[in-house]
């Protein structure tokens, strides 16, 4: 299950009928500005920059315009079909774009270099709908197109570079407009989002740039035009603060259909060399996007998958790995690749907490909740790869009560190497039985092991309940709590018209973090020097309120903070290398070695979309 804002596999957007409805609704709600009666008015002889205006919303939204002229700079024959036009004679205002998208719904009949005149309606299209919080795209809809001439030179591109993009990300949203920036005058010399908005629809170019987001299944990648902006050691751009965004990131797509020219495969750290040029679009999945008419060449910089050190005899190695909806119907190749990573890249950890193990029938919604076949297929693959014969513990969830892919019943599972560590089974619990902490002579113990933490708490509604287990290594008890907190689904993107964007999903994770924190406090209250590890897909950053709640009272420390800033990430989303997966330690875990093992997130070819985490210490 993707941990950042999810999207469906189908990227084609049917919007010809939706455009007017969206705009009318937005105008009525006062979200986009303009007059709801403007559709009854006409405007003749206007230029593109008149339509674009000096804010994010056209001053002519809803109006019928006639005689709008420009040169075609790009044609899109798939997805949101249409073409871009640009006025070759720019005005003197840097806030007004000279380019504009023309939505045709069917395959356009114009070609790049055509000079055209259009009669159309000015609309504001919100990719993803009003509830997404996305900015709107100013466009012409229902066009009547007249080709005036052909073979004209395309207007010279505006170069987007480290020097042209401001370091400040966005203005603070207008409190009177609910935190929206829609009505604020653009200041392209002060803010990156304003700069990109001032180029909406314009023919732009970038020079050779570093890839910071690998090619994905939707034929897109991310680059940065700011080579030294929060650079990671492996070539990415680390995301380290809500207050300091990475303004050099830019999404790249191609206007050439894949059947004619495959999209290049790139990993983080590769170079997109030469010139990449085309109209600047705005879409639901990343905001401002260079839709390339001319696409540069990817140069492989040889990024390699990392391998962690093997634990010493007296060290306990604990790892966490989100294996992305693993179920028995997945190809054997996926199981083998994941198993090879456990053995080779993770050096066969003593305890491995897995997230997103699905039930025995996967996404088939047939009431199955057991996952023994899924786990057996995986542990068999690990043995075949030369790894240990792991044993396992888990608690089956209630059917369709823990979120994730419907029917899949994802859950956390403990694997452990019985040659190195033992598991303390104690009144094994079920999906609704809560484990608690008890004590005897200064030592803590779980009432149920494996058991779930506070499963009736509403914080876990439609979400994975934490799995707590009690292990023994060299005579010392170690408590491990495997987690998979609620996803970021529903959060607004970084390019939202709300600045700062709304992060609504954070509220649930905050409650989840408080529940886990309270449980750890119970353990530490009974055994001050207890070894407790809270591991898993926390789905939130090391600087987030979620992590702050987990660490409340000093009972936990986010081990990822022991790494240099440029190594703190487990996931790459929209060109940001960021932390989602974590291992947190109790005060009893005094000395440890931590490793975020980068084997997936930076690569176009992934076994999972997450990087596993490993912590080694001496209990």
Task: Annotate each language-model stretch with its function.
Residues 1-40:
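Secretory targeting and sorting signals
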Residues 9, 131-132, 401-404:
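Intrinsically disordered, low-complexity coil segments
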Residues 14, 44-50, 373-377, 557-558:
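Secondary-structure junction/capping motif
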Residues 22, 27, 31, 162, ...:
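Conserved beta-strand scaffold positions in the cores of enzyme catalytic domains, especially
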Residues 34-36, 140, 211, 423-424, ...:
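A broad structural signal for short, well-ordered beta-strand segments within beta-sheet-rich domains
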Residues 41-317, 321, 325-351, 432-435, ...:
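Extended non-catalytic accessory segments flanking core domains
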Residues 289-619:
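Divalent cation-coordinating acidic motifs and surrounding scaffolds
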